[in-house]
């Protein structure tokens, strides 16, 4: 039976039991000693593919650990699960949908059927539409109501309609095309719209309203605010189509808003929001970096798809990263995972991976609705490299929690300044090294003694300078961030998340927890504005409503 129809209790599998026994045997494992004993540990636990180099040697593992983890992947039927996803089986069981974001980066000649219909022609038809629109805007042929060319594009969307496109647009800023500036509007906070619109001219601004359903509250409120602003700045309803386009599966609602049908880019229900940057949701990416680079992004993701489907599990980047996450989360008690990019342009990758991982694997029931028997997705957090060293890295080094980390760093900078990049790269490596090595009590005392400190003071200070070490991390190195390598990097994390969901037996492609807050929000809003007099379901919420109503002006 398919894994998504008959979820397993992973804790009852022989492979899981073997890993528990192995975990007990690894209690005293020292990475420092492992490196000292094996001069080829780095070569054994590293690999290269799709323009990415992964060093996973600084982990609490040996070859037996890897073999046992791969055995777990085999026992849960991972190979069949991968085939199920790529072939279009309905693996999103709770919503009755296939999961085919990977189709968006497949070559035009491929065939893939959904409900008996080959979807690849439609996928490439939309890609051609994107190419045509981007060309018209970049060539100055798409003009606003005053016949001036478009200079600014504002993407209005939230969640997956925002985080992925923003990440890629900023990560590939060195590839930005001249003449058009791209902006993002996500939050319903009016201050965000105010600050953005203050620097725009309505006559040269194009808004992209990105919402699969075209009823996402934050997106529609911001779209309405943008339309009101556009009209107040001199635009007309008759010319609205020149300044508003949509990415949505709800064509009727977009037309009712004022878009022309030919300016509405479709979405499919087999593409989830957090996996949608490869679709027309990626239109602002194509506008920012050009369609040639956008297609390179897709191509890079496709190469990772191929690697994921064909590489043996012990040499498969997404699978190995997923298995390491299971190892720490389920056998070492880790509750969080840090993403630490040492690259200014990648500063938003943590936000995208937060949604990708936490919205996908933040689940507590199996595919059949029964409770899980073990912990699932971790908290994903982090931030840009050296800044974090002077903020939260302290907790990574000397805190009481085990928090595995991924370091991401390019070899070449787009903007070399003196020896800055050498120092940046050195900092990245030294942080992973420090997490692994730590500092013993003897080393701390010797260091203080060499500075001439007396023994009484050494005895007092040395315990504070001891760093446990043995903290695991992965290091992902790219020669230079490019569309192709970035596509591979993002796709790698997508597949990592999927692998973990298969092992835990959960559905990575729904997000029912998000819906409850939306439902309750309507009632809270009605009570805030006085259109609903009934009290809230609890005293705390009602008290906060009363506090707002007693003080709010405007």
Swiss-Prot record:
One of its GO terms (cellular component) is cytosol. GO terms for biological process: gluconeogenesis; glucose 6-phosphate metabolic process; glycolytic process. Pfam families: PGI. It catalyses: alpha-D-glucose 6-phosphate = beta-D-fructose 6-phosphate. Signal peptide: none annotated. Pathway: Carbohydrate biosynthesis; gluconeogenesis; Carbohydrate degradation; glycolysis; D-glyceraldehyde 3-phosphate and glycerone phosphate from D-glucose: step 2/4. GO terms for molecular function: carbohydrate derivative binding; glucose-6-phosphate isomerase activity; monosaccharide binding. Keywords: Cytoplasm, Gluconeogenesis, Glycolysis, Isomerase. The active site is at 359 (proton donor), 390, 518. It is an enzyme of class 5 (isomerase). It is found in: Cytoplasm. The keyword Cytoplasm applies. Its EC number is 5.3.1.9. HAMAP family: G6P_isomerase. Catalyzes the reversible isomerization of glucose-6-phosphate to fructose-6-phosphate. NCBIfam families: PRK00179.1. Belongs to the GPI family. This is Glucose-6-phosphate isomerase. It comes from Pseudomonas entomophila (strain L48). The lineage of its organism: Bacteria, Pseudomonadati, Pseudomonadota, Gammaproteobacteria, Pseudomonadales.
């Amino acid at each position: 039976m398919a894994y998504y129809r008959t979820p397993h209790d992973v804790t009852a599998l022989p492979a899981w039991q073997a890993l528990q026994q192995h975990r007990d045997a690894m209690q005293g494992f020292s990475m420092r000693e492992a490196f000292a004993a094996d001069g080829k540990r780095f070569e054994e636990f590293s690999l290269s593919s799709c323009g990415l180099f992964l060093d996973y040697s600084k982990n609490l593992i040996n070859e037996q650990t890897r073999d046992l983890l791969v055995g777990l992947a085999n026992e849960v039927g991972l190979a069949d699960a991968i085939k199920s996803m790529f072939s279009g089986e309905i693996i999103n069981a709770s919503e009755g949908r296939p999961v085919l974001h990977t189709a968006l980066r497949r070559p035009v000649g491929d065939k893939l059927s959904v409900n008996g219909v080959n979807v690849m022609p439609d996928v490439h038809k939309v890609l051609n539409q994107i190419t045509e629109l981007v060309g018209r805007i970049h060539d100055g042929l798409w003009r606003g109501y005053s016949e001036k060319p478009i200079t600014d594009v504002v993407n209005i969307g939230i969640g997956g309609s925002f985080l992925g496109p923003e990440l890629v647009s900023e990560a590939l800023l060195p590839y930005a095309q001249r003449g058009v500036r791209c902006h993002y509007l996500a939050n319903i906070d009016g201050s965000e719209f105010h600050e953005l619109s203050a620097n725009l001219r309505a006559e040269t601004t194009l808004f992209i309203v990105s919402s699969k359903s075209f009823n996402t509250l934050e997106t529609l409120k911001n779209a309405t605010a943008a339309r009101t602003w556009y009209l107040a700045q001199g635009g007309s309803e008759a010319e609205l189509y020149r300044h508003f386009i949509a990415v949505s599966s709800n064509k009727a609602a977009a037309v009712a808003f004022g878009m022309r049908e030919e300016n509405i880019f479709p979405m499919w229900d087999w593409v989830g929001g957090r996996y949608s940057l490869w679709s027309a949701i990626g239109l602002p990416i194509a506008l920012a970096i050009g369609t040639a680079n956008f297609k390179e992004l897709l191509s890079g993701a496709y190469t990772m798809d191929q690697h994921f489907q064909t590489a043996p599990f012990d040499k498969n980047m997404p699978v190995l990263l997923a298995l390491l996450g299971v190892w720490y989360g389920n056998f070492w008690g880790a509750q969080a995972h840090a993403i630490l990019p040492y690259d200014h342009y990648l500063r938003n990758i943590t936000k995208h991976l937060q949604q990708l991982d936490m919205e996908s694997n933040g689940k507590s029931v199996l595919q059949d609705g029964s409770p899980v028997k073990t912990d699932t997705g971790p908290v994903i957090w982090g931030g840009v490299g050296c800044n974090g060293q002077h903020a939260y890295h302290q907790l990574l080094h000397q805190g009481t929690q085990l928090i595995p980390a991924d370091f991401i760093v390019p070899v070449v900078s787009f903007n070399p300044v003196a020896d800055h990049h050498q120092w940046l790269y050195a900092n990245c490596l030294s942080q992973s090294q420090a997490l692994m090595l730590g500092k013993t009590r003897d080393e701390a005392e010797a260091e203080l003694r060499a500075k001439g400190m007396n023994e009484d003071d050494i005895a007092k200070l040395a315990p504070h300078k001891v760093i446990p070490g043995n903290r695991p991390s992965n290091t992902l190195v790219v020669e230079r961030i490019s569309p192709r390598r970035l596509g591979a990097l993002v796709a790698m994390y997508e597949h990592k998340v999927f692998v973990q969901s298969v092992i835990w037996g959960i559905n990575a492609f729904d997000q029912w927890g998000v819906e409850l807050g939306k439902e309750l929000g309507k009632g809270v809003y009605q009570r805030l504005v006085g259109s609903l007099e009934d009290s809230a379901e609890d005293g705390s919420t009602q008290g906060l409503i009363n506090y707002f109503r007693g003080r709010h002006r405007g």
